[in-house]
UniProtKB/Swiss-Prot annotation:
Cellular component, GO annotation: phenylalanine-tRNA ligase complex
This protein's UniProt keywords: Aminoacyl-tRNA synthetase, ATP-binding, Cytoplasm, Ligase, Magnesium, Metal-binding, Nucleotide-binding, Protein biosynthesis, RNA-binding, tRNA-binding
Quaternary data: Tetramer of two alpha and two beta subunits.
Coiled coil: none
Binding note for cofactor: Binds 2 magnesium ions per tetramer.
Residue ranges occupied by any tRNA-binding domain in the UniProt entry: 39-148
Catalytic reactions on record: tRNA(Phe) + L-phenylalanine + ATP = L-phenylalanyl-tRNA(Phe) + AMP + diphosphate + H(+)
B5 domain residues: 401-476
PANTHER family reported for this sequence: PHENYLALANINE--TRNA LIGASE BETA SUBUNIT, PHENYLALANYL-TRNA SYNTHETASE BETA CHAIN AND LEUCINE-RICH REPEAT-CONTAINING PROTEIN 47
Family: Belongs to the phenylalanyl-tRNA synthetase beta subunit family. Type 1 subfamily.
Residue positions binding Mg(2+): 454, 460, 463-464
PROSITE patterns: B5, FDX_ACB, TRBD
Protein name: Phenylalanine--tRNA ligase beta subunit
Amino acid sequence: MKFSELWLREWVNPAISSDDLAHQITMAGLEVDGVDAVAGEFNGVVVGHVVECGQHPNADKLRVTKIDVGGDRLLDIVCGAPNCRQGLKVAVATVGAVLPGDFKIKAAKLRGESSEGMLCSFSELAISDDHDGIIELPADAPIGVDVREYLHLDDKTIEISVTPNRADCLGIIGVARDVAVVNQLPLTEPDMAEVVASINDTLPIRVDAPQACPRYLGRVVKGINVKAATPLWMREKLRRCGIRSIDPVVDVTNFVLLELGQPMHAFDLDRISGGVIVRLATDGEELTLLDGTKAKLNADTLVIADHQKPLAMAGIFGGEHSGVNEETRNVLLESAFFNPLSITGRARRHGLHTDASHRYERGVDPALQHKAIERATRLLIDICGGEAGPVVDVTTASELPKQATITLRREKLDRLIGHHIPSEQVSDILRRLGCKVTECGSDWQAVAPSWRFDMAIEEDLVEEVARIYGYNNIPDVPVRADLVMTKHREASLSLKRVKTALVDRGYQEAITYSFVDPKVQALLHPQQEALILPNPISVDMSAMRLSLLTGLLSAVVYNQNRQQSRLRLFESGLRFVPDNTADLGIRQDVMLAGVIAGHRYDEHWDLARQPIDFYDLKGDLEAILELTGKLSDVQFRAEAHSALHPGQSAAIYLAGEHIGFIGVVHPELERKLDLNGRTVVFEVQWNKLADRAVPQAREISRFPANRRDIAVVVAENVPAEDILAECKKVGANQVVGVNLFDVYSGKGVAEGYKSLAISLVLQDTARTLEEEEIAATVAKCVEALKQRFQASLRD
């Protein structure tokens, strides 16, 4: 909001400078965006009277004038402005004057005629961009007076950012209230006395939507002269607030809007059929607006209508048919309170944002309408003449906002502010803010003023007290708190530690939306039901994710489309699985997922560009599982997954419980998702891994280790992992390492069978093992494999 400093000082005039006033307004919570002079720097410009005005003998577009500036003689000045005429009061730059831009006025001859000064336009004095003609001052302007003094051009404009909760400050009165409260000064309101009706003319008003319009005031004013000139003082106030003067009727309603924050509208009375009806539009109903555009209305749009058609979009924009024009003689003034919810969003729907909608959406003082209509009536009659009828007031009191009654506790006030403010001062601040205050022991009960509908809870009062008391007056007190050393379980593995390990292995962390495209998710999890949002951000973000892979694979595609061929990404976060046994029917699991694509290594002169495979990601995952201390309890089992390659994927089990999966993305899915090349993914339930096995210290053997290799032939479908586990189990006391180092099938091995070459490392912590003991342990392993898997030693 932009306003004139002098206009504000008409309401409240603290004895402080403009800069201090701007700082004070900012500290009161209304951030000042800028303070600017209303006119350029100039001197030597005075009020003059055009005594004579005649045609220049040598130029068609110039006039020769004689100007009275209160001196000993009349000044001869040549002027080219089309509006220059005899009897006009003008702004005269006399010889020696300096105008903005360091332009000095000198005596000169123009086409043979002497000119002893210049008649100035607004643009030449850097007051506005209006350069169509010279300034026309009021007829009663005193001759010879400095124009800067006469027009109060030592004024400044102050522009503030008004937060949504302070709609009461979208008018001079609201800002003035805050300045008055801070400076403990009275508020000086202009004359807003009731205008006594001089005629009995009224217009019937009916409100069919009282919830949307709890109060509607209308007043007939007849016999006005729309062609009357808006007084210069009003035009200047409007200009300094960034409003262009249009005609006196519109200027008056804009003036009241800026002064009181109450939007108003004037209808051409003679164009209203029957009476005014405040109602909701019918779906598809059309209204031609003041700017000539046609608006197709929805059923939730509030309109002001007569008995035949809509006249205006309530609180937003007037209609062309009932708008005031040069032929208007009789008007209906409207001053209403519209429920903010009935206005919010309607203007944007039609690509509009007006001063009225801006205020109504945030809220207008429901007790302001009578004051506004009386103020507008007085100004309109003073400028345009006419006679006013009585005010017609249609109010549904039960639908008007109720003033909140709030209890403020001393304990809460001191705790939130961190400083004790004397009770007398607290009471005084609340009363100066307009609250009705009742002191209840050490506490207060306050009724918020009608214009402060943002005061609703106790914290609002605490904020107001601190704001007016002054944040700078609250002493800085160092925060004192006991440092509590929390216990850390050795078994707890930090997710951050795992993330760091992945980053160390060349991965980058991704953070994707929990809202995903249901179509893409259905490709990954065709058998699982997803949670669909009733109010999604967009159609492709309308489902809650069942796994992290939907977002990660989308991130891979996004990066591949931007020339990133080698990718290593991981993410941790929640998945949302419908589950009737869970709270609210949704099970939320913390998941950890990763994806790799492209080449195994970055481009290097000494390394071949090898594509990644299943085992690259499996190795990285095993490194993470090693941190948990549970790698020995983890099994990778061949199981089908709809999103993964059937021959290059595995389910992950921990102590027999399924916790995730790993594998190459199915080729068909790669095609549908536009993935470029082989992509390998994993996902595990982090909460199953967060408690790690605490490492147990054991003695390092000082005795030599012995390695024995065996090759056993087993059926193709026997997992090598089961073979290794059986060897560990049988040789538990002496076998300290078991490793698979070769797999062979083909010549020399029967069809349907495979040969597994296994190394056994044997060692004892107390002595050196004898050859007979080693052979016996190896024999036990072979026998166990024979009994369980029908294995045989390969020749």
